[in-house]
Regions:
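A short, solvent-exposed beta-edge/loop patch
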Residues: 135-189
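C-terminal motif of bacterial Sec signal peptides marking the signal peptidase cleavage site
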Residues: 16-20
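A short acidic-to-branched-hydrophobic micro-motif
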Residues: 101-122
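Positively charged n-region of N-terminal signal peptides that target proteins for export
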Residues: 1-9
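Short, surface-exposed beta-strand/loop micro-motifs that present aromatic residues
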Residues: 93-104, 142-151
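Second-shell loop/turn segments in exported
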Residues: 46-52, 109-115, 159-173
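N-terminal "mature-domain start" segment
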Residues: 22-95, 169-189
């Protein structure tokens, strides 16, 4: 009976130690994410990646977002299991991908699309013009989608974080600040 109790205590101790390590790792990731959010603007570090360091295409934008750690990572690289290739033709784009990630413990969806500026079809022109004018677009009979264009209008971002109330956002929340940072860096690309 003493051995049985000792075995249960050992298993409990191992579980507590293992969970404790995971908890510290999670805190470390959250702390790093918070530090990254606080490092925006003029106080950003010199080693922060710059858009000019990446190819001017969708894969370059994805690499840029990966370097900034906006997308889900696994073993220091983009976690491909979180990536979905989208039917970009629905919005007239050349190609697009959707990424499932998280920030502040909340699920986030990031969709990135690339347009061929020399060959915009009518759908692309309509979507781009709508996003420029109102910050959103509609396709088919679906509800409107909030979206952002890069400064050169070559790329489109759809950023979805259900923890942010778009009607009355808490501008002091970490998730709101993170979204604004992502949008700011996206627009520069």
């Amino acid at each position: 009976m003493k051995r049985f109790i000792a075995a249960i205590l050992c298993v409990g101790l191992i579980a507590a130690v293992t969970a404790g390590c995971g908890y510290k790792d999670a805190l470390s990731k959250e702390n790093k994410a918070t530090q990254a959010t606080e490092a925006t603007g003029s106080s950003a570090t010199a080693d922060e990646p710059k858009p000019a360091d990446f190819k001017d295409n969708l894969e370059g934008l994805i690499s840029y977002f990966t370097e900034l750690e906006y997308l889900a990572m696994k073993d220091g690289k983009l976690d491909e299991s979180t990536v979905t290739v989208m039917d970009a033709s629905l919005i007239g784009a050349k190609e697009g991908k959707k990424f499932i990630t998280a920030y502040g413990g909340k699920a986030i969806t990031i969709e990135l699309y690339e347009y061929d500026l020399k060959n915009l079809n009518d759908t692309a022109k309509t979507v781009v013009e709508s996003v420029k004018n109102s910050g959103e677009f509609t396709i088919l009979d679906l509800p409107s989608v909030k979206a952002y264009l890069s400064d050169d209008e070559k790329y489109l971002l759809i950023y979805t974080d259900s923890s942010i109330d778009d009607e009355k956002p808490d501008e002091n929340s970490d998730n709101y600040k993170h979204r604004e940072e992502v949008i700011e860096n996206f627009r520069k690309f």
